[in-house]
Amino acid sequence: MIDKQFEKEEFKKSVKENVKFLYRKTLEEATQEQIFQAVSYTVKDVIIDNWLKSQKAYEKQDPKIVYYMSMEFLMGRALGNNLINLGAYGEVKEALEELGLDINCIEDQEPDPALGNGGLGRLAACFLDSLATLNYCAYGCGIRYRYGMFKQEIRDGYQVEAPDNWLKNGYPFELRRPEYAKEVHFGGYVRVEWDPVKNENKFIHEGYQAVKAVPYDMPITGYNNDVVNTLRIWDAEPIVDFNLDSFDKGDYHNAVEQENLARTIVEVLYPNDNHMAGKELRLKQQYFFVSASLQAAIAKYKKTHDDITKLHEKVVFQMNDTHPTVAVAELMRILIDEEGLGWDQAWDITTKCCAYTNHTIMSEALEKWPIELFSRLLPRVYQIIEEINRRFILEIQQKYPGNFEKIKKMAIIYDGQVKMAHLAIVAGYSVNGVARLHTEILKNQELKDFYEMMPEKFNNKTNGITQRRFLAHGNPLLADWVTDKIGPDWITDLSQLSKLKVYADDEKALQEFMTIKFKNKERLAKYILEHNGVEVDPHSIFDIQVKRLHEYKRQLLNILHVIYLYNQIKAHPEMDFYPRTFIFGAKASAAYARAKKIIKLINCVADVVNNDASINGKLKVVFIENYRVSNAEIIFAAADVSEQISTASKEASGTGNMKFMLNGAPTLGTMDGANVEIVQEVGEENAFIFGMSSDQIINYENNGGYDPDFIYNTDPEIRQVLMQLINGTFSSDTEMFRDIYNSLLDKRNMPRPDQYFILGDFRSYAEAQKRVEATYKDEKRWAKMALLNTACSGKFTSDRTIQEYVDDIWHLDKVIVKKN
């Protein structure tokens, strides 16, 4: 394993000893889960050697460190990924086989760490992988959620949220670090007293509730370079564990009250915020991990540096979306109240340390907090934001005298709310979007006033994915084929994939490529049969949409089109129709009623379609339960068609589109997010583009003129599909999908009916689907298209994205960890 010559016998001995010492069992007596733990601890031993070596190298070379602060880190399983990065996957597989063990069965015992939900968290995970692989010193900073967002179960077609108890057996790839615990303070009040020495007011936070933040460190291995960075996730514990006096008096509730209050902070990701208690808990979570992370970063800096005013030379805090943006004010608080700096000096440091990534143009996702809540929960931090806001308004007035509209649009505090994105933009030295189109929309639409005032801050960093997880680990058959054709350098230089273009007209290579695709489809079909009880034909077109469930992502457009196809087959049973399998995977937020109803609709349509013998299996619909990284790897490898059908202008980037492309699935999509750049790389002839442009959508939104009612009244096939939502075709309860029907047509629907232009794009989408079918029937043409998607995906590696962050924003130096 990289550091020391891998000895199979030594590895096997270590696994057996771990089983004995951990469980007092022999290997033959141990359960699969116990064997997973034993194997993981054996691998972790090697990782820890490299981890220590990396820390020594960092201490010696004193590099600038990026702290990547994110509410989510969707890591996926660690065992297989670490083995690939250590260069030991094949050897460990052989060693386990010699012990009579199957590495795939062992990997399946590992829970997906429930530290994230969607693209935001998976991007953060890919970035950590690339930072380590590219030899940069980085810490991920987040929360150690006990139950994640939720484990999705489908019961009677409905999403049911269950706790995702990923820690129930302990997690071998983490280390508790109580020696680095920090205190985080909530509530209380601020007392002001005069400091005669400094001749200024001194602010003292008193009467607060204190919570202990205890870090757990996870190793992040670089590929084939011995670098191990750290993901530090914070657990919340009470300052005093247990009130024995209360317990002895029979007051059992009070005995554990402090523990319960602390634990609540880290129970779940994104607690329901439809009520004030939920809003307060979310703000608590955000401040909790940000404050602990900043305290830890500054303590680490001060161990080897005396001058706090040079913090920005060695530290950068990258705020991943608006969740961690309270970091701006918390850093100011630490520098002023704890380090004794004046306002101007603290502001100068803060504005050189903090950078902000915007991930959305959806206004509801640009967080705003009620002043009453914020000032009560974080009184000193709120005072600092008030002062930042006061000074910023003066800047606006100087630049735009008398323009009160500018103040209204740009103020950090306005109309009873604290606007976190505005705080991040004002204080951050860099503001980046995550795809070219997204960044242009930010500059010209959503954040136009800020861009006009401070254009130098704005830049684009198109997202990327790590090929080490989503090809090397997720699709080993294709990975081996690629290596056989062009060598292994693609694992750290994805631009090498362009060398595959020479095989685009090579019939033998195309046949090999499609044989691998078919084997991966068989693997997914087996998974579906085991988990859904539905038999799907791997010879059919696997048309897949897997992503967070949101109306703008338009899973509804997809399932309405499935209904349309079903109607076509029923009306014309003799028609030449190539068999299709439509596969969905998505979690809906627990409080998002319409999104959950769309899941129910998909499952109701599946029940009808899959059980209709008259269509001879030409059409199948599958909803994969509990979509997550571990089943995503199986899904991406098996896809024929990548559904990327968001309303143009709404998707910031997307990264699922890149994972599908890397695995040889052409994009069926709108010109939105990173789809635009995918088409630029692969050519429009190797994708299936449909729908209105972002300019057309924005024009309709700003000026009106879109009339879904007209479409409904003039297109009988669309009308039939919509009527089937409410006439009992898919549910005996004709009101079951009334809300979905009304959302598309009822003029009382706010802000307008069919907010995401589903009916407006329906015909264009249906035509694109016809092109998919026609192309797929031409086997050679389809194979060439699929191969070219893989060959042209080199741009979309997170290695490229991270290098752009390093060059343009972070300015880090590489650190070399010497191999033994």
List each model region and its residues.
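A conserved ligand/cofactor-binding region detector
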Residues: M1-N820
